[in-house]
Amino acid sequence: MKADELRKLDNEQLRAKLKDCYEELFNLRFQQVMGKLTATGRPRMVRRDIARIKTILRERELGIES
């Protein structure tokens, strides 16, 4: 997701999205180990989404608006 889309969500929605991303990353890693992962770039995209969400949550915690 784009950062602009994520900034429109409230904190609870962001935390739910973060949980979903972690679950997806877990499943992707499992598929990779089993040799069934076809979208090899997807884990990287999910990790970046996690970083975006964590950054937005931290900015809000510190009172930084972008």
Curated annotation (Swiss-Prot):
SUPFAM superfamilies registered for this protein in UniProt: Ribosomal protein L29 (L29p)
GO terms (BP aspect): translation
Matches recorded under InterPro entries: Ribosomal_protein_uL29, Ribosomal_uL29, Ribosomal_uL29_sf
UniProt keywords, alphabetically: Ribonucleoprotein, Ribosomal protein
A cellular component annotation (GO) from this entry: cytosolic large ribosomal subunit
Listed GO MF terms: structural constituent of ribosome
Gene3D superfamilies per record: 1.10.287.310
One Pfam short name: Ribosomal_L29
Similarity annotation: Belongs to the universal ribosomal protein uL29 family.
Name listed for the protein in its UniProt record: Large ribosomal subunit protein uL29
UniProt gene name: rpmC
